Amino acid sequence: MPRPYGADAGPDAPTLVEAALFEAGVPVLIVPDGIDAWTAPRRICLAWNEGDEALTATLRALPILAQADSTFITIIDPPQHGPDRSDPGGLLAPFLARHGVRCEVDVLARTLPRISDHLIRATTDRDVDMMIMGAYGRARWSEAMFGGATRDMLQECPVPLFLAR
């Protein structure tokens, strides 16, 4: 699908994306203009926040992840307290490796205003050709009113964006 927001988006595009994610329960691949959607991604950024949506996206994308040369598990500002605090992504990386995914963990401090700013920067810094993330970790109305990482990425992600929830 093309981006659902922006000057070139049709009036029903956001509704179609949300219907696929919420009603049909299927992943969605958003492909920016000018990018070949038929080329298998070699380098992938996997946005990880330990949420249910991120886990669902990861599981749905396992066949894609297993075929890639590199996957960068990107964790932004992980919790400072909890069982995983000393090793963010420490449970996910071995799980992915058991499924044939070649991955490494990138833990980033939150230094930019929006989570999406970090994710977009990660696509450039790591020269990835796909972003995988969970969609709408907050209520849809909240993202519509106040913005959120999902909506920002739908508008601005420079590489194909695989979303699931």
Which residue ranges define each predicted feature?
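Short, well-ordered secondary-structure micro-motifs
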Residues: P41-R42, A57, P83-D87, S116-H118, ...
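Short alpha-helix boundary/capping motifs
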Residues: G10-P11, G51, S86, P113, ...
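Charged helix-capping and loop-helix junction motifs
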Residues: A13-L16, S86-G90, I120-R121, M145-T150
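Intrinsically disordered or low-complexity boundary/linker segments at protein termini
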Residues: M1-T74, E156-R165
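Redox- and metal-dependent alpha/beta enzyme cores, enriched for Fe-S-associated oxidoreductases
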Residues: E50-V101, D106
